[in-house]
Amino acid sequence: MREMRVGHGYDVHVLVENRRLIIGGVEIPYERGLAGHSDADVLLHAICDALLGAVGLGDIGRHFPDTDAAFAGIDSRILLRRVAQQLKERAWQVGNVDATIIAQAPKMAPHIARMTAHIADDLGVAIDRVNVKATTTERLGFAGRGEGIAAEAVCLIERG
């Protein structure tokens, strides 16, 4: 009998000067970037949290703490690949990932196809098992004021 689990992840980072904006493993031209210990890829962090949560392994901070210099500036695609490996070691497979980027600016639509391809590649799944979309908050809240960017992700994992 096939066992299935669902995971949910959420992440948010503040926008700051003098940082590159990396979302979904894609560098997006913008005057500010996300602050963080790693590359601050809010989308990949939310996906990592969803996958880790589905397996019952806590969250990204437990596995890749911001107090560990080894993760300073690290490409979050590396973190996602490591999470995927942890699933594989426990005989779990990714059924699908559905994620939403929450940002007033910049526009994400031109970059979503590349983000989706990176995520599918890093997880070792077909591209149709990954969905990435973006929305604004109609200028409401921290994202609407351009203070930061958030992302949410849900995943289904299966084994057996």
Swiss-Prot record:
Gene3D superfamilies on file: 2-C-methyl-D-erythritol 2,4-cyclodiphosphate synthase
Catalytic activity: 4-CDP-2-C-methyl-D-erythritol 2-phosphate = 2-C-methyl-D-erythritol 2,4-cyclic diphosphate + CMP
GO BP field: isopentenyl diphosphate biosynthetic process, methylerythritol 4-phosphate pathway; terpenoid biosynthetic process
Cofactor note: Binds 1 divalent metal cation per subunit.
Residues that hold 4-CDP-2-C-methyl-D-erythritol 2-phosphate according to the record: 11-13, 37-38, 59-61, 64-68, 103-109, 135-138, 142, 145
SUPFAM superfamilies cross-referenced by the UniProt entry: IpsF-like
EC number: 4.6.1.12
Signal sequence, start to end: none
Annotated positions binding a divalent metal cation: 11, 13, 45
Pathway of action: Isoprenoid biosynthesis; isopentenyl diphosphate biosynthesis via DXP pathway; isopentenyl diphosphate from 1-deoxy-D-xylulose 5-phosphate: step 4/6
Transmembrane segments: none
Molecular function terms, GO-annotated: 2-C-methyl-D-erythritol 2,4-cyclodiphosphate synthase activity; metal ion binding
Keywords linked to the UniProt accession: Isoprene biosynthesis, Lyase, Metal-binding
Requisite cofactors: a divalent metal cation
Source superkingdom: Bacteria
Quaternary state and interactors: Homotrimer.
Similarity section: Belongs to the IspF family.
Annotated function: Involved in the biosynthesis of isopentenyl diphosphate (IPP) and dimethylallyl diphosphate (DMAPP), two major building blocks of isoprenoid compounds. Catalyzes the conversion of 4-diphosphocytidyl-2-C-methyl-D-erythritol 2-phosphate (CDP-ME2P) to 2-C-methyl-D-erythritol 2,4-cyclodiphosphate (ME-CPP) with a corresponding release of cytidine 5-monophosphate (CMP).
HAMAP family: IspF (MF_00107)
The name this protein goes by in its record: 2-C-methyl-D-erythritol 2,4-cyclodiphosphate synthase
Source species of the chain: Thiobacillus denitrificans (strain ATCC 25259 / T1)
